[in-house]
Amino acid sequence: FGALDVSIINFLSGCTVLSMTMYSVIKAKIAKDSVINMKLGTPLAIGAAIGGLFGKELFSYVESLFDTPNTAGAVQAFVLMLITLGTLIYTINKNKVHTLHVTNLLACLIIGFILGGFSSFLGIGGGPINLVVLYFFFTMGTKEAAQNSLYIILFSQITSVGRSLFTTDLSQISIVLLIGMIACG
């Protein structure tokens, strides 16, 4: 296939994640096994989608501050390390932590925005971070948090892939490669 630009690789990866999350969410709905809390999950997902756009812009800005992309990558890695450390500390001590029961629409939008912003800035799906946030702010169990996390990621990926359709030259993409990644994802 040859070497592809990073923006093309990111687009292909985003399409793969989008297809995986869409499949998981739809499969759970059809099987009547979905525990997605639409009242909380939808504002979280909308906030995450908007936050994801902000996170991409923030990363572009941070990247423009340095002469080499590696320096921006180092900033990204440092922030990821801090968040991962916080996630680890929470996970180890979660039985000792008093969780919240956030239900306010604006709070859900803001929490979603922050999740989407971090996930996009860091270039990650957000899974483990989403789970910790859903456990803490919404006192969700493991299955409910996992399904709501996939729902949030689904919205974020729709926005991200949609943005890429308008901002990335996709002429290098082999349709066979795209279909293969989506089907095998």
PLM regions with names:
Residues 1-8, 129-144:
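Interfacial segments of multi-pass membrane proteins
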Residues 2-6, 25-117, 166-185:
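Juxtamembrane transmembrane-helix boundary motif
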Residues 10-18, 49, 146-157:
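Transmembrane helix-bundle signature of multi-pass membrane transporters/permeases
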Residues 18-22, 77, 81-84, 154-158:
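Small-residue-rich packing faces within the transmembrane alpha-helices of Major Facilitator Superfamily
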Residues 99-131, 137, 151-157:
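Helix-loop-helix "hairpin" substructures at the membrane interface of multi-pass membrane proteins
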Residues 143, 151, 158, 162, ...:
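C-terminal transmembrane helix-loop-helix hairpin of multi-pass membrane proteins
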